[in-house]
C-alpha cells in the first residue's frame, strides 16, 4: 500500500487491530452510514473505545479510537473525548483516469482536534502516546531505537 508521510502505527499493525476488533468486538449498525457498510465496536483494555467501519463495496476500512476523559466546569463534571484518532485504508479503485490500472491502496492516520463547540473540525499528526496505547492493546512491544554511536562510546 502507498503509505502517507509520517505514519506512526503502520499498515501491518493497523491490520492486526482490524483483526482483533472483528474477532473480539460487537457487530453493530450504529456506526455505519451507508447500506453496504459493516460496523464493529470494541472496548480496549485501557477503556478506549474503538469503532471499525468496513465498506463492503470498496473495501475501505476505517478505525476510530476514542479515549474518554473527564472535565469539570464549575461544579459540574462532564464526560468528554480526551483524544480521537482515526486510522484508515482506502483501497485503490480502477476508473477512467487510471487507464485500467488499479492504483495502490492508501493508508493514513490522523488525530482529530475538537473546536470550542466540541465538534471535531481539524486534524493533526497522531501522537506517540496513542500509538503506544494501541501497541499495548495488541500486545506488541514498542520498537526500541538503535543504541550505540558517540554516547555509547562515552559510557552511556
Name each model-derived stretch.
Residues 1-156:
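Short low-complexity linker/loop segments enriched in small residues
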